[in-house]
């Protein structure tokens, strides 16, 4: 007998499985697009290159680097990339929190406040030892001004002019502020001279160095914020506001601009409030350094001393007074 022409030359029941054949096909265009999108998002959050991610995924799936991905590999490949992306997103978020926190640590005594807080609350001494949730909590508390910030130690003020090192420090802060705001260095220095109250040709006194540095750093920090408020202004100050200062600045803001602590401030309002804080502190410092005329509260012998002085200027009266005193003493005895 001869086989029927056109019939497959294979045993009955051993025909090729269509599903098995499809799984051995290369990745479809849709599948490759899904994987490429995941890889694009992944490399945007990491320092890896596209080829490196493809190779790492194949290694995880047990596929040789030079072997092509097949359709049957797609579910495992998608899951692998999704997991990698989740880890990268979490790491990126943690880096952002740590970056914001590190920036705030350079403001005022925030570093000391954070160090005290994490030691008391978490029993740790370094930010690297905290969990992501703990880092977020510390950042939130610091941004909202809810950490107890110790007052910086005050150095005695002096009328001497700025030292070269102090002038260079201010100049560096001016340069940073100019880069952040687009304002010219010359205009910023002019504002500082006007704030300091020095006349043309005079030098800024060293006693205003700390206040000017605080003013410059606060302006730079707030210029990077899209919605500054009184709360963020307070947090931006290197030398934090004392309770009476905070009350005064709130009253000034309410009276001048009718704004509340949560109101978003304009650039002009931010600068005016910082100027107001600067002038208040300089004025308060001047009052504290003003010499006081100290006199005794009670001088019981003052009248007697004045009387003796008057009598000593007139010997005759002094002699008569002495006789009267002796006579009275004789009568009493």
Swiss-Prot record:
Keyword Transmembrane helix: yes
Residue spans, topological domain Cytoplasmic: 1-311
Stretches of the chain found on the membrane's Periplasmic side: 333
Source species, domain of life: Bacteria
Cellular component GO terms held in the UniProt record: plasma membrane
Mode of membrane association: Single-pass membrane protein
InterPro entries: Flagellar_regulator_Flk
Compartment(s): Cell inner membrane
Region of interest (Disordered), residue spans: 1-27
Biological processes per GO annotation: regulation of gene expression
First-listed, main subcellular location of the protein, grouped into a coarse class: membrane
Membrane-spanning ranges: 312-332
Keywords attached to this entry: Cell inner membrane, Cell membrane, Membrane, Transmembrane, Transmembrane helix
Family stated for the protein in its record: Belongs to the flk family.
Role: Acts as a regulator of flagellar gene expression by modulating the protein level of the anti sigma factor FlgM upon sensing ring completion or hook elongation. Flk could inhibit FlgM secretion by acting as a braking system for the flagellar-associated type III secretion (T3S) system. Plays a role in hindering to flip the flagellar T3S specificity switch from the rod and hook-type substrates to filament-type substrates prior to hook-basal body (HBB) completion possibly by preventing interaction of FliK with FlhB.
Protein name stated in the entry: Flagellar regulator flk
Source species: Salmonella typhimurium (strain LT2 / SGSC1412 / ATCC 700720)
